[in-house]
Amino acid sequence: YAPNATVDFVNVAIVDWGSKCQSETENYLSAHPDTDYIISIYDSATQYIVPAVKSTGSSAKIVAYNGTPFAVDYVKSGDIEMLIGEDLLTIAYATVDYEMRTDLGMTQVEEPTLYRVWTSENVDEALNADGKCEYGIGYGDSAKQAYEKIWGLS
């Protein structure tokens, strides 16, 4: 909680990320050199935000959401401070479970999907043998086991 924090927004449409995200971030950081954090609602935009922070010499830290492998690699390299990742396999299982229950007229159940906060302290758990992140690593397999048991697949 930061009662004295101020928040500004720099909105760049997804279709414009490649042409505007870096320059808009650079312009903002140049005008606001005391910026502490940049929050990217989609981590795919960080491929443009990271170079902007570096080119301006800003000390702003980057945090983001999604868990896209290259963004998790940015956590490993220290370019992103924190990333909230979602397990796509769990989301896929939950989606199929919902659709199957609907088709079979079964009662729906509330099923949380898995999220994990990636930082420099735990990011190695998301890496494969080559030291790169890939989807599905680092979230465990409890959801897969549970869905397979529910649907008689194990």
For each feature predicted by the language model, list its residue ranges:
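A residue-level marker of the well-folded mature domains of exported/periplasmic proteins
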Residues: Y1-S154
